[in-house]
Design a protein with these regions (language model features):
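Active-site proximal loop and beta-alpha junction motif in alpha/beta enzyme cores
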Residues: 1-154
Length: 154
């Protein structure tokens, strides 16, 4: 974390596409994010690069489960009804989408071994993350920049 005169430096000129304002750059390093310990373990916790995965009342998906820093479920955007260029407000403004993502996230936590039963999901509300991917597409980010999108996490 950048520090100036003993104080955290929050301002700066580092820009991250998709973030609306520049700030101080915080560099991080992952030594071995899938290392055993705490919540570490296999990078692919199911043992597969791609799983055929059933989420009750939602559907069957080709999914990749990765535990490398932040446990994440990768899904094809089209398989969940998106194009892959949706902005945050599009998802956050849709209560049905949020409920669907929460169910996917909860069942993903079980699939990844992060919890033992779906009933434990409420106690683990932030992971795994869901990333939906699509073919690269050009779109305008929330900050107004033209981007060629490869992946969007939620």
């Amino acid at each position: 974390v950048p520090v100036t005169n003993g104080q955290v430096q929050e301002t700066g000129d580092f820009e991250l596409d998709g973030v609306t304002f520049p700030a101080a750059e915080v560099q991080i390093e992952f030594l071995d994010p899938a290392d055993d310990g705490d919540e570490g373990g296999d990078m692919f916790p199911t043992g597969n690069v791609v799983d055929e995965w059933v989420v009750p009342e939602i559907g069957t998906f080709q999914a990749t489960f990765i535990n490398a820093g932040i446990p994440t479920i990768f899904l094809n955007a089209e398989a969940i009804g998106y194009q892959g260029t949706e902005l945050q407000d599009h998802i956050n403004g849709d209560a049905a989408a949020l409920a669907r993502f929460e169910k996917i996230r909860a069942y993903g936590a079980v699939q990844m071994g992060l919890i033992k039963d779906i009933s434990e999901a409420a106690a683990r509300q932030h992971t795994p993350k869901i990333a939906f991917v699509s073919q690269p597409k050009t779109y305008t980010s929330s900050s107004g920049k033209q981007l060629k999108l490869l992946m969007l996490t939620y």
